[in-house]
Amino acid sequence: YETPNMEKLAQQGMMFTQAYASSISSPTRCSLMTGCNASRHRVTNWTLRKNTKTDAVSNTLEVPDWNYNGVAQVHGTNNTFIATSFVQLLKDNGYHTIHCGKAHWGAIDTPGESPYHFGFETNIAGHAAGGPATYLSERNYGYDEAGNSTLLFSVPGLEKYWGTGTFI
């Protein structure tokens, strides 16, 4: 594939020729948001519920005390890596910042669960869960008619699309 705009951007900036991505989404997403690798931010597994580890129990391994609440820009939540996001830096320098899709940087009920916390001015469907409850607008993306979440992975911010046939 030809990607002339991306190649031009790389020529003007910095191109990384050696990189690492975790096979689990949360650590890599946290790395992209903070610029730190997983060994530095210590988010080494997926995040979901506040103060809840997602590691399998092992009789053989001693699992380290990792940052299972994800990343945030403010102090106050234990087991959270604190950093300024690159999005906040862009916003502070006049860019309009939009997030669309999965977020999954912090556990539910922590600052890191919301893309707005990291400097995004617009958020379309981003939240703490690593995927949508449903892709179907006929099911209100996991909400009942009163707007109450019916599923853990209910997708926020898509109310105007409920019942429209819009598939995400």
Predicted features by range, described:
Residues L48-H96, A103-I168:
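Formylglycine-dependent
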Residues Y1-R29, G35-R40, H96-I98, F118-H127:
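Short, structured active-site-proximal loop/turn typified by the sulfatase FGly-forming signature C/S-X-P-X-R
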